[in-house]
Regions:
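Buried hydrophobic packing segments
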Residues: 10-14, 47, 73, 103
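Short gly/pro-enriched beta-turn/loop segments at secondary-structure junctions
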Residues: 6, 42, 81-83
Length: 129
């Protein structure tokens, strides 16, 4: 539901353009953006169900999500002069093989090898080198 990384001046912009208070803007950014803003749902299970049904907005939500996560992983890899492992935590990271399958392809340039079968079958799936 959260907005992700946004320019901090969005608070001022929404206040002036939409007449929103700071509290309204913070509520909007934290409860009405992110997955909900793209497809109307915040739960990954619902979003992947919609994707299976052919919903383009749900597919876009997860494509953007995967892209943003890959950007963060790349930035961390650069800041730390490489990576030893990529570890998925939290509700989506630990419980959604679909999300891991959307995120990991494209990270091979880091030397990572993703095992989609292990990701699907194992509760603590791994991306290993």
């Amino acid at each position: 539901t959260r907005s992700g990384s946004v320019d901090p001046f969005i608070v001022d912009y929404l206040g002036k353009k939409r007449g929103m208070t700071v509290d309204e803007t913070l509520y909007y950014l934290n409860k009405k953006c992110g997955f909900i803003g793209y497809c109307g749902y915040s739960d990954c299970r619902d979003i992947y169900r919609l994707i299976d049904e052919g919903d383009e907005k749900a597919r876009l939500a997860m494509d953007v999500f995967g892209y943003q996560i890959r950007k963060i992983i790349g930035a961390y890899a650069a800041a730390m002069n490489g990576l030893d492992a990529i570890v998925f935590t939290g509700g989506i990271g630990e419980n959604s093989a679909d999300a891991r399958n959307d995120i990991c392809p494209g990270l091979e340039f880091l030397g990572a090898e993703f095992d989609a079968e292990a990701s699907h079958d194992a509760p603590a799936a791994r991306l290993r080198k």
